[in-house]
Amino acid sequence: MRDALGREVRSVRISVTMRCNMACVYCHREGERPGRSELSAAEWGRLLRACAEIGVRKVKITGGEPLLRRDLIEIIENAEGFEEVSLVTNGVLLADYAGDLAEAGLDRVNVSLDTVDRKLYRKLTRSRFSPDDVIRGIEAAVSEGLTPVKVNVVLTSETVKTLPTLVEELADLEGLKLQLIEPMGSIPGFRPAHAEDGLRALGEYEPELERVRTFHSREVYRLNNGMAVEVVKPMDGVMCEACTRIRLTHDGKYKGCLMAPPKPLPRDDFGELVRTLKEYVRTRDDTFEVHQGTSVMGRMRGDVSGR
């Protein structure tokens, strides 16, 4: 299905929880505890069926930290039939669940790992965890075939300095892609960095442009060790023109854009749910451009993860 601007909606990001076991300095939720508003696995199954009815082909599960949900496996099983089901995670619990996730039908994962420097990692995540926990999770994901594993790195003046070491730590693993993500908004105690800063820190690379989806190409580079590096600029260039996704919040509301306010969806009548989704998609606009002069973090609260 296409919206009024001719963009085909092909994917949905579902935030299954706002709970998190970290309090990352750049996260707009900062580990905030929600009320009892999370949808059940069955309710997610119903919403996903409605998404399939309007032509959505890919599902990305986000949070919060999705692995905190005890019924995550059931949610993944309810996504059967889509072309791709992926998961965004901080990775610290991934080693324990990778096998079950793969068996349930998960195709691949995005894992957040901004640095392998232990002190800096704890400063960024404000947690008791270590980069070693995340690396074990990445290794387990690769072993279970949840590839390509995209390793998300939020760029700051400090994480840029540790990028070469991070690449060295992961160099022996196949099936990885590094994503250099420019942060949205300010980061307390840190100076944001640009993708070009990260590329310079990585040293020699050979540029190759790779079209990753219709309407949209991101710069992709290949390091001398063969690892692909993808540049993600969330609010730059043709972001809105290229957008082919919709979002559903942890409490079952629709967002046509990360920056948009959530809209309610019917809970009881499935036909009405499908009709409402179609109407929301049909009238989807370039919300970022509309709200360019407002607070980024203010527009993002109420979720859905931008990772």
UniProtKB/Swiss-Prot annotation:
[4Fe-4S] cluster 2 binds at C240, C243, C257. The keyword GTP-binding applies. It is an enzyme of class 4 (lyase). Pathway: Cofactor biosynthesis; molybdopterin biosynthesis. InterPro entries: Aldolase_TIM (IPR013785), Elp3/MiaA/NifB-like_rSAM (IPR006638), MoaA_arc (IPR013485), MoaA_twitch (IPR010505), MoCo_biosynth_MoaA/MoaC (IPR050105), rSAM (IPR007197). One of its GO terms (molecular function) is 4 iron, 4 sulfur cluster binding. SUPFAM superfamilies: Radical SAM enzymes. Its EC number is 4.1.99.22. Belongs to the radical SAM superfamily. MoaA family. This is Probable GTP 3',8-cyclase. It comes from Methanopyrus kandleri (strain AV19 / DSM 6324 / JCM 9639 / NBRC 100938).
